[in-house]
Each structure stands twice: as structure tokens, then as C-alpha cells.
Amino acid sequence: MRASTVVLLASCIGMTAFPAFSQSPRPYTNKLAPYVASPAHVVDLMLEMAKIKPGEIVYDLGSGDGRIVIAAAGKYKAKAVGVEISPKLVASATADIERAGLSADARVMQGDVLQTDFTGADVVTMYLETKLNAELRPRLEKFLKPGARVVSHDYPVPGWKPARVETVEGRVMHTIYLYEIQLPKK
């Protein structure tokens, strides 16, 4: 999807209040994190742990097929934004959002999570590797306000102490980390 189409689509569906990217995303590679979808039961637990309230803004970093975005907007009535670098996954997720009738409250845009402005986000979800979480940490600290929640599937954010950790059994074990952004120490 071309950038002009994304901008036009965003303005048409009334979601222009969300911050834009500071730069064009780098070309798609899976070097940031490979695409692996979070199982439905893990998505449910991630969103339940985040305690999303209706109208809150949720960003899903590396949103893949958009399942977290769709669940956040559909079940929790959040304003949900996915950030995904793969144009094919963005197109697929956008089609799924439209089929679910959630275009007014959900979208997935093509972009690099390391260039994304999350200002205003109440919740950030992610299924990225620990190294990428470490690279994201300064941006999360810069853009997230006190009280915001970060939920990470399987990989911790180095240097942060989780407020809650849950292990989920299934075909494979999954660990969910919940972090709560605190006021800066003086």
C-alpha cells in the first residue's frame, strides 16, 4: 500500500488524531522480528492483563495479521493502531478490520516500530525479541505517560521490572509480561 493511500485511508476513517511516523519505514525485512502470530488465548490474556478501558488508545507493535488490534477494538472498544513493516501483512490486516466492521476504531499502518511516535498511547502490546524490546525501551519511556501499560509476549523489556508475569500453557508455553509506566524518579 502506498503512503498516499495510507494517509487518504486514515483521513477517510477519521483516525488522523494518531501521531504519524517521523520517517518513512525502512524496506521490509524480517530482521526486526520474525512474524509469528500470538495464539488467540494469549491475545485474550494480554489484553485482559492490560485492563483496557473503552476509548483508550492501544498500539500493537509488529502487529502482523492485526489480531490484537481487532480484539482491542472489538472486545474492549479501544481505539487500536497496529504498526507493521510488511506491506502484505498490513493489507491483510486492513481487510480483516474492514470485514469485522471496525474501520472507525482500528487500523494497521505500515511503519517501523523504531520510528513510531506512540504519544497518547494508553497501552502498547508487542511480540518482539528481547533485543528489539531493548532498542524500543527509550522510545517507550519518551512517549508513554505515567499509567500507560506495556504488555510483551514471551520477551521481557531489559531493565524494566514487570508488575505482573503470567505463564500460559498450550501447545507451547508462553510468558506474558505486564509493565506499568511510573512517574520519573526525581
Task: Describe each PLM feature range.
Residues 79-84:
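Conserved SAM-binding motif I beta-strand of class I
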Residues 131-186:
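C-terminal substrate-binding/active-site "lid" region of AdoMet-derived donor-dependent transferases
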